[in-house]
Amino acid sequence: MIKVTVGNNVKREAVIIDENTSLRSCLEANGVDYTRGVMHLDGSSLNPGDLDKTFQQFGITEKCFLLNVVKADNA
């Protein structure tokens, strides 16, 4: 089990999940809209197809941040 801080610019929540969970499943289970903005895993931008990989495939074993960052038009 791993601790994932999941959320966006405004709201973040720490959840405990199985490391064999896909990133997409984690986001959907926690109500995070990943269709807008840039997805980051521990500060690194995710690439196409990465959402269907598991935390274990990324080498996450204890804790991480999974965040959707939306930039404002004037930012």
Regions found by a protein language model. Give the residues of each.
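Ubiquitin-like/PB1-type beta-grasp interaction modules and other compact soluble beta-rich domains
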Residues: 1-75
